[in-house]
């Protein structure tokens, strides 16, 4: 099991410096509410976790996150420091520094420095770095850019030529060097016993990414439209079909065509939601009406479905359900997971948007008392604030730091 211990953000969007500790004394905090006025940096926390998740999975920085980084010649480096803990064993940190061009939609971004380290949870133990990478190439405006870098670790992993080639590749792709699949191939192929700790730490960070659930502003804004994104964690023991993530519930007139092989996922999701929704919203159940089967030109079969809201026998299209209820339905998969599983970390932006404040307050109170995982959310609603003890609340501010 891995827990989120802290996050430090510097020069991302309008955040000059921000730190959040997800631990109170020796206990991990199961619910953290982030509050602050508009423009104080609440959503930057969600953005940063999206960037971290992409980098640590070996992927590129998401295109929709380009533009959140400050140009390096204006305010300094964009820094993120993530700290995790494997209870009873060790703390792990990952530090990344990013350089960026002017903050436009086509913003160029380079990972210029990364570091992975750990500290055993033993008396007197110190942090030990495992691997460091530093970019030593050209600036963004170079006519003939040169991409070079250095890699330092406790044992040699790659030669200089291989490092240079990989540096160019990850720079072009806006990826992490330390979490690149190419570097992992070198590490696993080396078969050096001295790298066993590094491989173990990589495994922990991979587990963190697998357990991370993010419900961002883009998903939240969709709940008021014709497509409601639904968070799910579907497992079918008979067919061995598994699906974790987000599926779309299209509410367009005339129904929604879904591939026949995905029909059990939707059907199972409706059944699963109906085990929980009535406990939160009395007399409400969801239905999925199945229409005719369509065969497309390529031979693939689709089923036409319609999603129905049933309120104590009164049936109408889910499209005309309130935005707040659709928002709860949309988030429910992640909320149930973080409530029941101690290894899940769910991050939800604007949790309160469109949701009736009394219902929201009751939900947060239940989670604060009994959730096993870690729920982190941003909110404007003071009703939620009343339901949380002070150590579970983080305030963002627009005041500048004066050094």
Describe the predicted segments one by one.
Residues 53-56, 84, 269-285, 367:
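Hydrophobic, Leu/Ile/Phe/Ala-enriched alpha-helical segments that form helix-helix packing faces
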Residues 63-68, 284-302:
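Long, charged, glycine-rich C-terminal linkers/tails
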Residues 101-281:
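Electropositive, glycine-dotted interaction segments
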């Amino acid at each position: 099991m891995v827990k989120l211990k802290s996050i430090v953000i510097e020069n991302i969007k309008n955040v000059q410096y921000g730190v959040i500790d997800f631990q109170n004394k020796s206990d991990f905090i199961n619910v953290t509410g982030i509050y602050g006025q508009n423009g104080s940096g609440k959503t930057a926390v969600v953005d940063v976790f999206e960037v971290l998740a992409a980098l640590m999975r070996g992927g590129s920085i998401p295109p929709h996150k380009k533009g959140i980084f400050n140009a390096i010649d204006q305010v300094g480096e964009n820094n993120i420091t993530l700290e995790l803990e494997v209870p009873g064993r060790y703390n792990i940190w990952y530090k990344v520094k990013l350089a960026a061009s002017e903050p436009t939609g086509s913003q160029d971004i380079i990972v210029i420095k990364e570091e992975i380290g750990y500290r055993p949870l033993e008396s007197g133990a110190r942090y030990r770095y495992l691997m460091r990478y530093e970019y030593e190439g050209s600036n963004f405006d170079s006519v003939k850019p040169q991409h070079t870098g250095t890699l330092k670790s406790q044992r040699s992993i790659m030669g200089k030529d291989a490092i240079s080639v990989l540096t160019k590749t990850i720079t072009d792709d806006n990826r992490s060097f330390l979490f690149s699949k190419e570097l992992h191939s070198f590490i696993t192929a080396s078969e050096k016993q001295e790298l066993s700790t590094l491989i173990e730490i990589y495994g922990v960070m991979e587990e963190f990414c697998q357990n991370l659930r993010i419900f961002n502003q883009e998903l939240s804004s969709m709940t008021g439209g014709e497509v409601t994104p639904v968070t799910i964690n579907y497992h079918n023991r008979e067919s061995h079909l598994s699906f974790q993530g987000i599926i779309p519930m299209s509410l367009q007139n005339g129904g929604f065509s879904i591939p026949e092989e995905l029909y059990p996922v939707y059907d199972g999701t409706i059944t699963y939601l109906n085990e929980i929704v009535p406990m939160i919203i009395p007399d409400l159940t969801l239905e999925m009406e199945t229409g005719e089967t369509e065969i497309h030109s390529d031979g693939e079969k689709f089923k036409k479905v319609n999603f129905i809201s049933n309120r104590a026998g009164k049936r109408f299209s889910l499209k005309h359900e309130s935005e707040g209820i659709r928002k709860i339905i949309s988030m429910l998969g992640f909320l149930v997971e973080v409530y029941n599983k101690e290894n899940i970390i769910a991050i939800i932006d604007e949790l309160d948007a469109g949701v009736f404040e009394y219902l929201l307050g009751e939900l947060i109170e239940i989670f604060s008392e009994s959730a096993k995982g870690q729920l982190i959310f941003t909110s404007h609603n003071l009703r939620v604030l009343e339901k949380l003890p002070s150590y579970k609340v983080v305030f963002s501010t627009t005041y500048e730091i004066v050094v």
